[in-house]
């Protein structure tokens, strides 16, 4: 793997060392943050028929310039704001508004751009709340759970990207040392190897087909329950980019 991509691995491994434990303060903060974001989204008037909009994106970006987009499963299994910082550790235990939150905020790989071929988004497995952050991703390990939750949206500043889940599996520390899955722009050979590995490890039967080297992918990562040496990865293939009605001026 490339030198740049290998350097990213340290941040990923450190991320999963932070086991989230029950914290009453964090639970209260998380619920307040989620309620506020939901209210901002509902108050918009530009596209009331859509679950998100350019107007909502602008308001949340004004509140936190690190805000990149809103990740939402069509089933609403997960609905989380996505931030990006210069440091992958920045939002491990920080709420969207900057206060302390043991469950942190879902964040995008610091070295990636929205035009990267592989965008990795990290979220905690929260032991005390099975609906928080990326904890619900474990439901996709079951075939029926995957089929019920296979469509994913990423709402950005001027468009919505639609993805289909194509693979779900666990990756070990040893495997992650070789396959630097969070690397945003792998070489052609690295990407080819990674896609082949994805399809080999996949534990689901993807209805819409396997991942392909021609795909742009969104990788969702969380920890495995009671095992910090492994991470669960959900691989999503991008299938469309659609501008909001009325447009917008870029993705930030």
Regions found by a protein language model. Give the residues of each.
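Solvent-exposed, non-transmembrane regions of membrane-associated and secreted proteins
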Residues: 13-252
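N-terminal Sec-pathway targeting helices
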Residues: 1-9
């Amino acid at each position: 793997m490339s030198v740049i991509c290998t350097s990213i691995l340290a941040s990923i491994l450190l991320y999963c060392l932070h086991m989230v434990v029950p914290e009453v303060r964090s639970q209260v903060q998380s619920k307040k943050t989620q309620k506020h974001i939901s209210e901002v989204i509902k108050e918009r008037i530009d596209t009331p028929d859509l679950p998100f909009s350019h107007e909502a994106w602008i308001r949340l970006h004004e509140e936190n310039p690190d805000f990149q987009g809103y990740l939402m499963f069509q089933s609403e299994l997960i609905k989380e704001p996505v931030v990006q910082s210069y440091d992958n550790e920045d939002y491990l235990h920080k709420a969207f508004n900057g206060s302390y939150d043991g469950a942190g905020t879902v964040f995008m790989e610091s070295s990636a751009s929205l035009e990267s071929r592989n965008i990795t988004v990290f979220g905690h497995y929260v032991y005390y709340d099975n609906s928080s952050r990326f904890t619900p991703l474990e439901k996709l390990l079951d075939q029926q759970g995957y089929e019920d939750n296979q469509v994913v949206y990423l709402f950005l500043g001027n468009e919505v990207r639609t993805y289909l889940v194509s693979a779900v599996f666990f990756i070990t520390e040893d495997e992650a040392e070789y396959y630097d899955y969070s690397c945003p722009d792998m070489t052609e050979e690295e990407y080819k190897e990674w896609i082949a590995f994805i399809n080999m490890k996949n534990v689901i039967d993807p209805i819409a087909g396997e991942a392909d080297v021609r795909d742009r992918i969104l990788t969702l990562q969380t920890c495995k329950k009671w095992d910090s040496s492994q991470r669960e990865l959900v691989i999503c293939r991008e299938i469309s980019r659609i501008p909001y009605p009325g447009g917008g001026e870029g993705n930030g």
